[in-house]
């Protein structure tokens, strides 16, 4: 990684390096997660690994950092943990993640659903 080691870094991938628990999607995860994991562990400044591919939101600790998977902007995958369940779409809202660094170098992530929703309403 050519980035300076004294600043936090984000690594972006399409395929997650970790299992999601959804067998049909895990069959298509990153091919060499251990090789990437060794690089991630070598650097102490990897704040987050950001991915897509799962078509649903997921967060998991891995190799000293957090893997954050964004929802899809097209369709979401049905959450099925049983083996031999074929992948299926579900009509959950599409969405995206918005990541930003605050003034204290903390990475803050919001998940935003895309669609037409009532509101905003006063909140007390």
What residues fall within each predicted segment?
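His/acidic metal-ligating clusters that form di-metal
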Residues: 1-66
């Amino acid at each position: 990684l050519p980035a300076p080691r004294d600043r936090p870094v984000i690594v972006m991938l399409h395929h997650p390096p970790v299992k999601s628990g959804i067998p049909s999607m895990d069959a298509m995860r990153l091919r060499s997660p251990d090789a990437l994991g060794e690089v991630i562990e070598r650097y102490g400044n990897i704040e987050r690994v950001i991915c897509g591919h799962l078509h649903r939101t997921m967060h998991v600790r891995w190799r000293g950092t957090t893997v954050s998977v964004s929802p899809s902007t097209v369709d979401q995958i049905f959450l099925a943990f049983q083996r031999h369940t074929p992948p299926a779409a579900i009509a959950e809202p599409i969405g995206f993640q918005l990541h930003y660094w605050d003034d204290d170098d903390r990475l803050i992530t919001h998940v935003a659903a895309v669609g037409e929703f009532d509101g905003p309403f006063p909140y007390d």
